[in-house]
A protein has these predicted regions:
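Catalytic domains that recognize anionic headgroups
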Residues: 2-166
Length: 166
């Protein structure tokens, strides 16, 4: 299993390098740009004494639920969209339910007005509201984090990392 752990860590390193390269490219272009990156799920890679690996368990672990949510704005974008930039800064420490927020945040970043955009779900908006976070179980049903049977170790990880549970 050490090879599996190395493989997963290498994907994290690759993604980190890719995002850094993309940001560098956007900076060199001196473009008016915004970038949002997130992941659809986390991964267990032997993170604790349970030796869990992969994802999609009926009862996920903290490591399957905690995913990155990164927004980068170019200097030109920040200067032209001060309110959006300030809203992102205001909301940066708040918990994000990525599955609910990505669509609305991207519409907000792109400046698209539509009846489908809910500003209370956009991290790039001052109206952003913290919502309960859900896990889509193996029967395609959303379940509140406190209703999926998380283990004590996983709840402790949320608290240790100052993340809201639930």
């Amino acid at each position: 299993f050490p090879t599996r752990r190395s493989s997963d860590l290498n994907t994290i390193r690759y993604t980190d390098g890719f995002l850094a390269s993309l940001i560098t490219l956007l900076q060199k272009m001196n473009s008016f740009s915004a970038m949002l990156y997130t992941s659809d799920h986390g991964e267990d890679i032997f993170d604790d004494n349970r030796k869990l690996f992969l994802h999609a368990s009926p009862v996920p672990s903290y490591y399957q639920l905690h995913v990155p949510f990164l927004i980068w704005l170019s200097k030109a974008y920040r200067e032209e969209n001060v309110e959006v930039h300030e809203a992102i800064l205001q909301n940066r420490e708040k918990p994000v339910a990525g599955n609910a927020s990505v669509f609305h945040t991207m519409l907000n970043l792109a400046g698209i007005q539509t009846p489908y955009r809910a500003d209370s779900l956009s991290v790039a908006n001052r109206q952003y509201l913290i919502r309960p976070r859900y896990y889509l179980n193996d029967h395609n049903l959303p379940k509140s984090l406190d209703k999926i049977g998380l283990k004590k170790e996983d709840i402790e990880q949320f608290r240790r990392n100052n993340l809201v549970y639930p």
